[in-house]
UniProtKB/Swiss-Prot annotation:
Gene expressing this chain: gapA
Induction info: Rapidly up-regulated by hyperosmotic stress, which is dependent on dstC. Strongly inducible by 8-bromo-cGMP and to a lesser extent by 8-bromo-cAMP. Not induced by DIF (differentiation-inducing factor- a chlorinated hexaphenone).
GO annotation, cellular component aspect: cell cortex; cell trailing edge; cleavage furrow; cytosol; filopodium; lamellipodium
Native source species: Dictyostelium discoideum
Keyword Cell cycle: yes
Ranges for domain Ras-GAP: 269-515
Coiled-coil region list: 146-185, 663-732
Protein name according to UniProt: Ras GTPase-activating-like protein gapA
Subunit relationships: Heterotetramer. Quaternary complex with activated rac1A, ctxA and ctxB in the absence of rgaA.
Any one GO molecular function term: identical protein binding
Length: 860
């Protein structure tokens, strides 16, 4: 093929169809950059290359027979040599055409790839940034941030209200049980509740009992809870030190109040940082990864509380609830009882109920004999098949929803896997069992066994449905922890399901392996600890005075173990600035909003290379200026010269001039302020300038603009999600109010059966001497002088149900009064607290209750 030489730079455009097919679909940002012509690559100059190619081909004698454009001949028909096999070198020409077409595509792909890489890295010039800004709508991002913050505050407030209602329901339930146990009158309980509400309202109006925080206290608590939120090592250590009876309330304070119930990148990053440290500490105290399953450790409790937040609840409601409802709850005749003995006993009972005669079946058969009976087998076999069928649906739903599993749960499992592999050199199956335990048993299983408690179903479950769910949960638990049922205890009846379990284990192993394939939180959430300095609004938490007091006391009690070795530990400094913890009781407990403030912000600023307080302001100003000035053009030859880059100061000076020329004083003012801010940041060492170029700063601006659309979309979704969350919370609040009404109705029904027979009978004050109370063990200690014991008497009366007024008299002179609450006594007795300390006297709780029961309660 003499005369045919293909130069390396030649590119061919075959015809109009080929041209359109070879054009790559570059993303919008890349297209905008290409159209502007401001790029550091010369790959995009395709038109000139194509002209060069056609000239080259004609010079080499390839003009004949290669008509690129179609044209009509003298007869009006379209003539093209493209498909004319009789033309010279037809096959060779087709090969060459294909090669050149491939080269066009390759060049376009390289061009797109390089521009995408430049976009991801933010390596754009000012003109390209302006081109991107022109494609974006100018909006006020801050307004959305403020709205989202307000929605979050409202949501947290609603969550707190719901929790208070739930506590009221639980307290009411407990009081009913205790009062019935002590033969209390239900009518008095209702009267006491009404009086308690009035008393509480009255006490709330009493300024002497209203707890207020002075400005210094408020600021210290703002600093304290910011420190706890952003420095996770304190809480990670504290959760291992507190008592078991304090754990649940404290974890609620941490996960619900301090980090919020809903998902947001900042709070999620912080809470996962807490998990990172807590998991590391927990696993440093055990000998193998499997010990996490065998011991009642802190991390499983943390995970349970964490998974009950909004994101975990939504997953369970969307994935698990439909399977539950369709296959178990709405199947009233479904019975998955696989215990052969129980099945046999049910057979006998049903036979006797149907016939009205005692069954002839032998009630004394051994288990091995029962399981061999054909009648029993005929019942068990279809139940096993049905159980497998339902388990298969749950299994499929769980496996196929991996990508919808909350990121935080997956990352926590990844941490466990990583530390287990590093610390213990654990085998893959051992780690898989641990991951399966946390994902299934500590998350999904709880919702399957008690869906009503997790609020993923509104229907009440029958006893049979609950038993069915327990059996289903057992099968899935063994499957996800890679175990089979053994021939012992209650497990022997589940052994027929082992074959199905074994058939799925390879899929489970792959699922658990895929589950931990997630990126680090800083990459996934696009958050790191330095983002704190760029927050446009300070974080806000809604917290009760009781929670503040509890946390304060726990920190003081464990400060020695919590503080760092440095002389000036931040936590210790804040605690020293605070007075003693608040004395909070139910009557004066209330919620406040804490705007969290970083007292030690300057310490973080020293660690980073950008002064974020000026950075956030300056970025917004630069974007505003770039929108208002003409697009900055670059000479083509400058794009290849690394020494010649954008002179940001010159651009800003031109902006000042442009503002004056166009009568836009705001533009000039903004540009001047940017120049001043740049000089300040440079003086602080936050940014560097080479010949007024500020290349690093321009890159920061580019990344801000490139990601702005995505950020806005995330905010839009978050706003919508928070609105829906608020609606659901208010629905649940309505449900709780209905539940309280149900309790009230129940109390009224009980009243019909347990009301006093003699409504006119009244309780007169009871007189009892000091010596008699001491003899009966009611009085344990007293500050009353011994000489006065003989002449001291107590008069006990009850004008209000559950409230006992005690007046002390020496002779006929009254020397003081006090009140005893039946609720307080019953609570202390239930909690095992032996003594009640009052002013000048200490009472034995149980002996006091006995006295009141004997002389008052039976007559109420």
């Amino acid at each position: 093929m003499e005369g045919l030489e293909i130069e390396d730079e030649d590119v061919i455009l075959l015809d109009e169809d080929d041209d359109s097919s070879s054009s790559s679909t570059v993303n919008n940002s890349s297209s905008n950059i290409k159209n502007n012509g401001n790029t550091n690559n010369n790959i995009g100059n395709d038109d000139s290359n194509k002209v060069t190619l056609m000239t080259s081909l004609r010079e080499k004698g390839w003009g004949s027979g290669m008509l690129v454009d179609k044209e009509k001949n003298q007869y009006g028909t379209i003539k093209s040599y493209k498909d004319d096999k009789s033309s010279p070198w037809f096959e060779e020409r087709q090969v060459i055409a294909t090669l050149y077409k491939a080269r066009v595509l390759l060049h376009e792909m390289i061009y797109t790839k390089m521009n995408q890489e430049r976009l991801l890295s933010g390596n754009l010039c000012v003109g390209e940034i302006q081109s991107l800004l022109n494609t974006q709508k100018e909006d006020v991002e801050t307004d959305w941030i403020a709205e989202i913050q307000e929605l979050k505050r409202n949501m947290v407030a609603e969550i707190r209200r719901n929790h208070l209602l739930e506590r009221d329901v639980n307290k009411l339930d407990k009081r009913i049980a205790l009062l019935i146990k002590h033969r209390s009158n239900i009518k008095d309980l209702l009267l006491e509740q009404n009086k308690g509400k009035k008393d509480k309202k009255k006490k709330g109006d009493d300024k002497a009992e209203y707890i207020t925080l002075d400005q210094k206290q408020l600021e210290s608590y703002q600093n304290l809870f910011y420190l706890l939120q952003t420095e996770p090592h304190y809480l990670a250590k504290l959760v291992t030190l507190i008592q078991a009876d304090q754990m649940e309330d404290f974890l609620d304070t941490v996960f619900l109040t301090l980090f919020g119930d809903d998902f947001s990148p900042r709070e999620e990053f912080l809470i996962l940082s807490l998990f990172r440290l807590a998991i590391g500490q927990e696993m440093s105290r055990i000998k193998s990864a499997g010990d996490l399953l065998a011991v009642e450790s802190v991390v499983p409790k943390m995970i349970i509380t964490y998974t009950r937040r909004k994101q975990g609840h939504e997953f369970l409601k969307q994935i698990i609830a439909p399977i539950l409802e369709n296959n178990v709850v709405n199947a009233p005749d479904l019975n998955l009882e696989l215990n052969a003995v129980q099945v046999y006993q049910n057979m006998i009972s049903e036979q006797e109920i149907q016939t009205g005669a005692k069954s002839t079946l032998n009630r004394g058969l051994a288990e091995d004999q029962i399981i061999q009976l054909k009648e029993v087998q005929s019942i068990l076999e279809p139940r096993v098949e049905k159980c497998i069928q339902i388990c298969e649906r749950f299994f499929t739903g769980i496996i196929q929803s991996l990508n919808r599993l909350p990121y935080g749960i997956r990352w926590i499992c990844k941490q466990i896997q990583s530390i287990a592999q590093k610390n213990f050199d654990s085998k893959p199956d051992e780690i898989a069992k641990v991951i399966g335990y946390f994902v299934y048993y500590r998350f999904i299983n709880l919702a399957i066994v008690t869906p009503d408690a997790f609020e993923i179903l509104d229907k009440e479950l029958s006893i049979t449905s609950r038993k069915n769910l327990v059996n289903i949960a057992k099968v899935l638990q063994n499957l996800f922890t890679l175990k089979t049922f053994q021939n012992q205890g209650s497990e022997r009846w589940m052994q027929p399901l082992n074959k199905w379990i074994l058939s799925k284990t390879s899929i489970v192993r792959q699922y658990l392996e895929d589950l931990i394939q997630v990126t680090d939180p800083s990459e996934y959430l696009r958050v790191d600890k330095y983002n704190e300095l760029t927050l446009k609004l300070n974080p806000v938490v809604v917290i009760s005075l009781g929670e503040i007091s509890q946390t304060h006391r726990l920190l003081i009690a464990n400060l020695a173990a919590l503080k760092m070795k440095e002389k000036e530990d931040p936590l210790e400094l804040i605690l020293k600035a605070l007075p003693a913890p608040l004395e909070v009781v139910d009557e004066n407990d209330r919620e406040i909003q804490l705007t969290l403030i970083n007292r030690f912000k300057e310490n973080i600023e020293k660690e980073i290379s950008i002064s974020a307080s000026l950075l956030a302001e300056t970025k917004e100003l630069v974007i505003s200026v770039l929108r208002s000035i003409p697009i900055q053009q670059k000479q083509q030859q400058q794009q290849h010269d690394d020494e010649k880059r954008d002179d940001l100061i010159s651009i800003l000076q031109n902006a000042i001039k442009h503002g004056k020329e166009t009568n836009n004083p705001q533009l000039s003012s903004n540009a001047e302020k940017i120049i001043n801010n740049l000089k300040k940041m440079e003086a602080e060492g936050s940014i560097q300038s080479e010949n007024n170029q500020y290349e690093g700063f321009i890159k920061v601006i580019a990344l801000e603009v490139i990601n702005r659309q995505e950020i806005r979309e995330q905010q839009r979704k978050e706003r919508m999600r928070l609105t829906i969350a608020l609606r659901d919370l208010r629905k649940h609040q309505s449900y709780l109010n209905d539940q309280i009404q149900h309790y009230t109705s129940y109390l009224k029904d009980v009243l019909l059966h347990y009301g006093p027979k003699d409504k006119k009978k009244s309780t007169k004050p009871m007189k009892i001497s000091f010596k008699e109370l001491t003899k009966k063990g009611v009085i344990v200690e007293s500050d009353i002088p011994k000489l006065s014991h003989g002449s001291t008497s107590f008069y006990i009366s009850s004008d209000a149900p559950g409230i006992f007024d005690i007046e002390a008299r020496i002779g006929v002179a009254s020397v003081g009064t006090l009140s005893l609450s039946l609720d307080d006594l019953l609570d202390k007795s239930s909690a095992g607290i032996p003594y009640l300390k009052l002013e000048n006297i200490v009472l034995d709780v149980n002996m006091t209750l006995h006295l009141l029961n004997r002389h008052f309660l039976k007559n109420i």
